[in-house]
């Protein structure tokens, strides 16, 4: 019974010891002097996102990856690498486990690193400051074997040891040799060697530096590690020294990886009796030796069986939890059938949260009727604009589905590009390319910014909008009516080229369909055509009307939603321009900022085209194909325009002053009380 109890105690001891070795096999070094962050902060989220992708990034880059993610003070810099020759799956597992270990141990430190591995050697390092090319000696971490070289053998041992260390340091820090034999940067500074020692068998050594440092710095880092061993652990039978920029390990047995306890082969028996043989695993400084009597010795097979059973059990539990979690996530983000047809990428919510700083106010670009827009940056450095639809808006969900299906089918230089979407729980996100110069109205209606839009730029903007709408109506696979063309939905890129945005109200027409009706009218007052406002009827000619309003706004620099008095009548911009046309005083319309650098005949021709677009009868309005033709060919004679719709007559209740308004003041009216169902029609390519 006593023997059995002793065996149980020893089993428990070796069970704990085995986990002690496993914990050392993933040693993390957290820098407590570099700074800290709050859990779940933007920096923490960026760190988690970056490290969670490291395994695939490192293997994709042949064993070495150096990158960053985030913006400003929340930016995370990281490096990952494997020893040269590591199989991709082995390298991937090593990086994955090492990164996870750092996340679990370095809970709030802004800097940390870990050299680890059981089948191969790998490194993961992160910081809130760029460290590429800089030698990192601190913080350092070290381990040693508590057993020692016998004093009478020390001199002979040192002669072999010193020569081996010198040779290995020179080999590891020689980038010329390694670069000539390796396609991967991970092998730039790497060396391993074995030297026979007459008393203790073989001395095995592995050294490696990160490839971003110079050969001189690599040599310095490894020499510092050797000096550290000589000063503090000289005479020990094995040492591991870890620094941010280099790895140093030697043992009296051959080994794989960084901290494994597996012997590739047993060292040859010593020629004369020695003290008890060295431990097969490096031990931490407070580890003590256990002397086991013959009658209480437990077999290695029993220990292995216990460890295997426990490890397998833990793995099964973890796998079960992961499967359950993934099933739950799939249920939460299951998409409607119509979204599955979309040709766009579905982003994980955590990716978008990390890219936008968890939708921070600092990254907010603006807000609209159905949500807010944020700037962000993806892991690969791509800048994005994220539209976050309001959680309380029923119309937002309809528009979300509509926009994904519509925009996913479109590819044109004058249409904003949809990169993807995210639909998880209550979050509905649309991810677009980032367009740096905001929208047309930001410049056009600001007296201090309007001077940046000279006539050449404005003419180019009109031409780009024309090509974009023509693509929607005629040249794309689908016939699409935008229904919400306005200055705030025309974005401008870095070169002031226009991109049409916001397809939440867009409708897809059949091949032979020319007109559609809706019982619920939505849109912005002033841009909507008369037939759409009064009868709910829309077609390609509805977009033409909106385009005509845009032309008049671009040339005049005036808002269509403002009121203007002329000849005793109250006019919006469209009817005001018509009166100028009738009075042949079109020069009064031209924005003073472009009068000096434009040809008045050319500008008046553009106004003429704008008036043709806003005619009351849809049949009188030209198609976008015709508009494109007359804009690019000045020799084509234009027909005389007919009066536009929405005349404001000077009668009772028509004077804006009686409503508390003054001439030129914006009414800013929009039809928001009624919601269009925006039913998504079947997508049929032409």
Curated annotation (Swiss-Prot):
One Gene Ontology MF term: protein serine kinase activity
Residues in compartment: Cytoplasmic: 324-686
Keyword Transmembrane helix in annotation: yes
Record-listed E.C. numbers: 2.7.11.-
InterPro entries: GNK2 (IPR002902), GNK2_sf (IPR038408), Kinase-like_dom_sf (IPR011009), Prot_kinase_dom (IPR000719), Protein_kinase_ATP_BS (IPR017441), Ser-Thr/Tyr_kinase_cat_dom (IPR001245), Ser/Thr_kinase_AS (IPR008271)
Domain annotation Protein kinase: ranges: 359-631
Binding site for ATP: 365-373, 387
Signal peptide: 1-26
Subcellular location, principal: membrane
Catalytic residues, chain numbering: 484 (proton acceptor)
Polar residues bias: start-end ranges: 652-686
Catalytic activity: L-seryl-[protein] + ATP = O-phospho-L-seryl-[protein] + ADP + H(+); L-threonyl-[protein] + ATP = O-phospho-L-threonyl-[protein] + ADP + H(+)
Record topology, Extracellular segments: 27-302
Biased composition (Pro residues): 266-280
Stretches for region Disordered: 266-287, 647-686
Coiled coil ranges: none
CDD domains, per database record: Gnk2-like, STKc_IRAK
Residues listed as glycosylation sites in the UniProt record: 40, 57, 66, 108, 128, 178, 202, 286, 289, 294
Keywords associated with the record: ATP-binding, Glycoprotein, Kinase, Membrane, Nucleotide-binding, Phosphoprotein, Receptor, Repeat, Serine/threonine-protein kinase, Signal, Transferase, Transmembrane, Transmembrane helix
Protein name as catalogued: Cysteine-rich receptor-like protein kinase 17
Provenance organism: Arabidopsis thaliana
Lineage summary: Eukaryota, Viridiplantae, Streptophyta, Embryophyta, Tracheophyta
């Amino acid at each position: 019974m006593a023997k059995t109890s002793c065996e149980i105690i020893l089993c428990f001891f070796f069970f704990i010891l085995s986990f002690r070795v496993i914990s050392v096999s993933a040693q993390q070094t957290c820098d407590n002097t570099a700074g800290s962050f709050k859990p779940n902060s933007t920096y923490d989220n960026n760190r988690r996102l970056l490290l969670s992708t490291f395994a695939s990034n490192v293997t994709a880059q042949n064993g070495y990856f150096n990158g960053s993610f985030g913006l400003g003070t929340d930016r995370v810099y990281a490096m990952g690498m494997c020893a040269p020759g590591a199989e991709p799956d082995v390298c991937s597992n090593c990086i994955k486990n090492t990164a996870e270990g750092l996340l679990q141990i370095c809970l709030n430190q802004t800097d940390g690193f870990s050299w680890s591995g059981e089948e191969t050697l790998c490194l993961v390092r992160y910081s809130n400051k760029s460290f590429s090319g800089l030698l990192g000696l601190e913080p350092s971490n070290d381990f040693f074997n508590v057993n020692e070289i016998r004093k009478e053998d020390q001199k002979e041992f040192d002669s072999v040891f010193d020569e081996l260390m010198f040779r290995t340091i020179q080999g590891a820090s020689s980038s010329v040799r390694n670069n000539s034999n390796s396609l991967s940067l991970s092998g730039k500074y790497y060396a391993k060697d074995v030297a026979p020692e007459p008393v203790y068998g073989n001395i095995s050594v592995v050294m490696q530096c990160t490839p971003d440092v110079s050969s001189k710095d690599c040599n310095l880092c490894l020499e510092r590690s050797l000096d550290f061993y000589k000063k503090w652990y000289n005479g020990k039978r094995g040492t591991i020294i870890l620094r941010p920029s280099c790895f140093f390990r030697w043992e009296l047995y051959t080994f794989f990886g960084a901290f494994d306890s597996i012997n590739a082969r047993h060292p040859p028996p010593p020629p004369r009796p020695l003290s008890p043989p060295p431990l097969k695993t490096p031990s931490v400084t407070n580890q003590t030796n256990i002397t086991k009597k013959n009658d209480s010795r437990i077999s290695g097979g029993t220990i292995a069986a216990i460890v295997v059973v426990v490890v397998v059990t833990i793995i099964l539990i973890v796998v079960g939890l992961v499967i359950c979690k993934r099933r739950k996530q799939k249920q939460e983000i299951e998409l409607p059938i119509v979204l599955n047809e979309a040709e766009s990428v579905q982003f994980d919510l955590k990716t978008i949260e990390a890219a936008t700083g968890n939708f921070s106010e600092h990254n907010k670009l603006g807000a609209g009727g159905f949500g807010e827009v944020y700037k962000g940056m993806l892991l690969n450095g791509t800048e994005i604009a994220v539209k976050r639809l309001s959680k309380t808006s029923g119309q937002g969900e309809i528009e979300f589905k509509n926009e994904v299906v519509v925009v996913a089918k479109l590819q044109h230089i004058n249409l904003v590009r949809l990169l993807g979407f995210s639909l998880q729980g209550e979050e509905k996100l649309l991810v677009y390319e980032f367009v740096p110069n905001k929208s047309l109205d930001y410049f056009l209606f600001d007296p201090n910014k309007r001077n940046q839009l000279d006539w050449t730029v404005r003419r180019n903007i009109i031409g780009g909008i024309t090509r974009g709408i023509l693509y929607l109506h005629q040249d794309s696979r689908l016939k699409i009516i935008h229904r919400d063309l306005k200055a705030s939905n025309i974005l401008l890129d870095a070169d002031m080229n226009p991109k049409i945005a916001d397809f939440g109200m867009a409708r897809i027409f059949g091949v032979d369909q020319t007109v559609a009706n809706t019982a619920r009218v939505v849109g912005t007052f002033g841009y909507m055509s008369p037939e759409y406002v009064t009868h709910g009827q829309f077609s390609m000619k509805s977009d033409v009307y909106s385009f005509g309003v845009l032309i008049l706004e671009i040339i005049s620099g005036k808002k269509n939603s403002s009121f203007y008095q002329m000849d005793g009548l109250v006019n919006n911009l469209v009817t005001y321009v018509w009166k100028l046309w009738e009075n042949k005083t079109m020069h009064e319309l031209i924005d003073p900022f472009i009068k000096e650098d434009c040809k008045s005949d050319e500008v008046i021709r553009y106004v003429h085209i704008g008036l043709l677009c806003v005619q009351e009868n849809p049949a009188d309005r030209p198609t976008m194909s015709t508009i494109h033709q007359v804009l690019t060919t000045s020799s084509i004679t234009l027909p005389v325009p007919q009066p536009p719709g929405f005349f404001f007559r000077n009668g009772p209740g028509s004077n804006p002053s009686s409503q508390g308004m003054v001439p030129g003041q914006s009414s800013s009216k929009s039809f928001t009380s009624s919601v269009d169902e925006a039913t998504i029609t079947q997508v049929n390519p032409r």
